[in-house]
Amino acid sequence: MARLITVAAAQLGPIQKAEPRGVAVARMVALMERAHRRGVELVVFPELALTTFFPRHYHQDIAEADTWFETSMPSNETAPLFDAAKRYNIGFHLGYAEIAHEADETGTMRRRRFNTAILVSPAGDILLKYRKVHLPGHAEYDPKRKVQHLEKRYFEVGNLGFPVIAAPMGTQAQINMGMMICNDRRWPEAWRVLGLQRVELVMLGYNTPSLNMEAGGFEAHHLRVFHSHLSIQAGCYQNACFGVATAKAGTEDGCELFGHSIIVNPQGEIMAQATSWDDELITADCDLDMCTLGRTTIFAFDKHRRPEAYTRITDQVGAVDPEVWRG
């Protein structure tokens, strides 16, 4: 008998800087209601879903950016999402900016800021938390850039690794579920760490601009979308899992986000894709038994992986020049 779960990518249109959290939460609750009518069991919302993508804005005093962060979850403002989960018997994934009061690597207690995602059960319990590892952009104001990308200024590198949880969801007694956030999707190491935990369903949110604002050169819009999809499709195929990738889309604070949310199967095929720049719900019926073929044949890790040949991946960070041939 098939192990089916109906999932949804709940793409959000733009959230402007002046809009309060309550506006975004109300839109997400409406998407959950729509998902309920379609028989969805798990809804995936984007990265930083409660506010505008604030790392494009520069604050000289980082503490001034704290207005964009959550200090508790659920909070009074996000409680309607948890209530909707219980009302509609739907699990959900939510990306947000987190302030945590916890010890750092030296053991010092302090305020720490992370780009975070959580997985919430239909009962409103937080099943899993993930903090973004691969932070793009820069830490200081760059006058050469029309739009800043200051994730390295406002967030610390995630300290929870890439965890997977085996938990009930929908009608399934157990699903192996993991998360990543935005830029993580471009790093095959992230997918492989999840794959090595037999992940069956990967959830990720993103806020990706249509244009690459780096000074290094121009990247066409169609390539931006292609590279996003390529990363997700390859990750799902090479680790025999489903992926639900949900975007923020449209023109937000004058910056265009390309959207194109997708749901991908373990063969790397796109099962559903968003076509608008607005709030949009795309759904797919995922048979988790489809994960078995890949992980017992081509990607049977226990039979074919050779970690002794991959030590450079963990021993080295930047690229180095190869040995020069002296023929």
Q: What are these model-derived regions, one by one?
A:
Residues 27-42, 81-87:
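A short, N-terminal amphipathic alpha-helix
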Residues 83, 100-230, 297-300:
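Active-site catalytic loop in hydrolytic enzyme cores
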Residues 72-93, 173-176, 182-282:
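CN hydrolase (nitrilase-like) catalytic-core segments centered on the catalytic cysteine
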Residues 49-66, 103-107:
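Metal-dependent catalytic neighborhoods of phosphoester/phosphodiester hydrolases
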Residues 292-327:
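A short C-terminal boundary segment appended to hydrolase-like catalytic domains
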Residues 51, 118, 129-136, 262, ...:
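Short beta->alpha transition motifs characteristic of CBS
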Residues 12-33:
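N-terminal phosphate-binding loop and adjacent alpha-helix
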Residues 1-15:
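Short beta-strand segments enriched in small/hydrophobic residues
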